[in-house]
Amino acid sequence: MDYSQFLYMKEELSLIAVILILFVVDLLTCPDQKGATPKVNVRSLTLPAVILMTLHTVINLFPGTPAEAFGGMYQYTPMQTIIKAVLNVGTIIVLLMAHEWLKREDTRIKQGEFYVLTLSTLLGMYFMISAGHFLMFFIGLEMASIPMAALVAFDKYRHHSAEAGAKYILTALFSSALLLFGLSMIYGTSGTLYFNDLPGHITGNMLQIMAFVFFFAGMGFKISLVPFHLWTADVYEGAPTAVTSYLSVISKGSAAFVLMTILMKVFAPMVAQWQEVLFWVTIASITIANLFAIRQQNLKRFMAFSAISQAGYIMLGVIGGSEMGMTALVYYVLVYLAANLGVFAVISIVEQRSNKVEIDDYNGLYKTNPKLAFIMTLALFSLAGIPPFAGFFSKFFIFMAAFNSGFHLLVFIALINTVVSLYYYLLIVKAMYINPNEEPIPTFRSDNYTKVSLVLCTLGIIALGIASCIYQGIDKFSFGMGM
């Protein structure tokens, strides 16, 4: 075996090293359930986890040339480096956000488990993104899904968390079964599962169309596209808020990137068929999610339908199947990451301090916690696509990608839905600044880790809006060197 091939997997190997280090540190620092004194006194694993993840991100940010390893099972491209870096940044923010929750007495001794499970999920996404073979893709998918199920049910003594975990596991099992059924059809008609070999065997016959339908349905569950979205609101509401934020951004972003990669590589000969399917799924996702979001009272359920709608917008980048669409997708995920995690950071700290998650509970938040209200407003404006915030530019680029690919009607419908989404995002802004509240959320100070996560999200929203040249940078970095 040529061991130099492992150098192409430096990102995965580096992340495995981070996981092992945190695992060992947790063994040395965490008191057992009987309250015994730990061997090494470390107040929190958050700081070591954040430092290690930051080093991991910086070290692996330097690009290489496109390459394959292990007979084509593993593929490396500069674009993959970017999407992995984006996922790393989101994961770091989630780790910072989770610190306040993990300080609770019932979760304090499980800090190490949370970090190891979170990074194990990220590792699975890495393998999924770099897969050059459907077997590698499926292994990565399951490596991401199984720890995620444990994270969703992490608050096992809360009924809602356990229920959400059960629903997520059942949904993951069902979607994996659909995927495997589709992959078996692909193998049966082509005799191979290598991404580079499959286009020569894809003819668009009826069995391959059925294979695509099952594959797309399985991925639709992962991305929360309509009509595969029914689990989303219940799981988002029941899971711990930090886990919900991770599920809504990191998991969705990686799955969308992988879906586009496979559609462009494997199913390129069936482009007319999958574009038609994606056309209607995109319209349904954006429209139905908007209608349901208007009716929500629980803020986490509200963000669930917002996430479904945003998944529809992300599909605008996928449907064109172009380099411009790929760049727009990555940029959109980056902006969505900053805005969505900003909202969830506010929800998380408010929930920890007041146990309130209803939209009406946020009435008058500006009077008691003006900084939190300001950050929430910036994030919601960005999600709505209001200029000059980053969300406006991300929507502009992804709309242009679809428009240049000839999907003019789809872009028009998406624009109408964007106007509709302004209404329900501004409802929360109205609640915070205008609506009176006899029992408002009390004034409180956030812990330092939460402050850092809020600052990072705020800077991301503002900087990505001002420096829209980042979009060109992503494109040059990725396609200037080869995808």
From Swiss-Prot:
<feature type="transmembrane region" description="Helical">
    <location>
        <begin position="330"/>
        <end position="350"/>
    </location>
</feature>
<comment type="similarity">
    <text>Belongs to the complex I subunit 2 family.</text>
</comment>
<keyword id="KW-0997">Cell inner membrane</keyword>
<dbReference type="GO" id="GO:0005886">
    <property type="term" value="C:plasma membrane"/>
</dbReference>
<dbReference type="InterPro" id="IPR010096">
    <property type="entry name" value="NADH-Q_OxRdtase_suN/2"/>
</dbReference>
<keyword id="KW-0874">Quinone</keyword>
<feature type="transmembrane region" description="Helical">
    <location>
        <begin position="209"/>
        <end position="229"/>
    </location>
</feature>
<feature type="transmembrane region" description="Helical">
    <location>
        <begin position="373"/>
        <end position="393"/>
    </location>
</feature>
<feature type="transmembrane region" description="Helical">
    <location>
        <begin position="45"/>
        <end position="65"/>
    </location>
</feature>
<dbReference type="InterPro" id="IPR001750">
    <property type="entry name" value="ND/Mrp_TM"/>
</dbReference>
<feature type="transmembrane region" description="Helical">
    <location>
        <begin position="11"/>
        <end position="31"/>
    </location>
</feature>
<dbReference type="GO" id="GO:0008137">
    <property type="term" value="F:NADH dehydrogenase (ubiquinone) activity"/>
</dbReference>
<keyword id="KW-1133">Transmembrane helix</keyword>
<dbReference type="GO" id="GO:0048038">
    <property type="term" value="F:quinone binding"/>
</dbReference>
<feature type="transmembrane region" description="Helical">
    <location>
        <begin position="396"/>
        <end position="416"/>
    </location>
</feature>
<protein>
    <recommendedName>
        <fullName>NADH-quinone oxidoreductase subunit N</fullName>
        <ecNumber>7.1.1.-</ecNumber>
    </recommendedName>
</protein>
<feature type="transmembrane region" description="Helical">
    <location>
        <begin position="112"/>
        <end position="132"/>
    </location>
</feature>
<feature type="transmembrane region" description="Helical">
    <location>
        <begin position="274"/>
        <end position="294"/>
    </location>
</feature>
<dbReference type="GO" id="GO:0042773">
    <property type="term" value="P:ATP synthesis coupled electron transport"/>
</dbReference>
<dbReference type="Pfam" id="PF00361">
    <property type="entry name" value="Proton_antipo_M"/>
</dbReference>
<feature type="transmembrane region" description="Helical">
    <location>
        <begin position="302"/>
        <end position="322"/>
    </location>
</feature>
<feature type="transmembrane region" description="Helical">
    <location>
        <begin position="134"/>
        <end position="154"/>
    </location>
</feature>
<keyword id="KW-0812">Transmembrane</keyword>
<feature type="transmembrane region" description="Helical">
    <location>
        <begin position="168"/>
        <end position="188"/>
    </location>
</feature>
<feature type="transmembrane region" description="Helical">
    <location>
        <begin position="82"/>
        <end position="102"/>
    </location>
</feature>
<feature type="transmembrane region" description="Helical">
    <location>
        <begin position="454"/>
        <end position="474"/>
    </location>
</feature>
<keyword id="KW-1278">Translocase</keyword>
<comment type="subunit">
    <text>NDH-1 is composed of 14 different subunits. Subunits NuoA, H, J, K, L, M, N constitute the membrane sector of the complex.</text>
</comment>
<keyword id="KW-0813">Transport</keyword>
<keyword id="KW-0472">Membrane</keyword>
<keyword id="KW-1003">Cell membrane</keyword>
<feature type="transmembrane region" description="Helical">
    <location>
        <begin position="253"/>
        <end position="273"/>
    </location>
</feature>
<comment type="function">
    <text>NDH-1 shuttles electrons from NADH, via FMN and iron-sulfur (Fe-S) centers, to quinones in the respiratory chain. The immediate electron acceptor for the enzyme in this species is believed to be a menaquinone. Couples the redox reaction to proton translocation (for every two electrons transferred, four hydrogen ions are translocated across the cytoplasmic membrane), and thus conserves the redox energy in a proton gradient.</text>
</comment>
<keyword id="KW-0520">NAD</keyword>
<dbReference type="GO" id="GO:0050136">
    <property type="term" value="F:NADH:ubiquinone reductase (non-electrogenic) activity"/>
</dbReference>
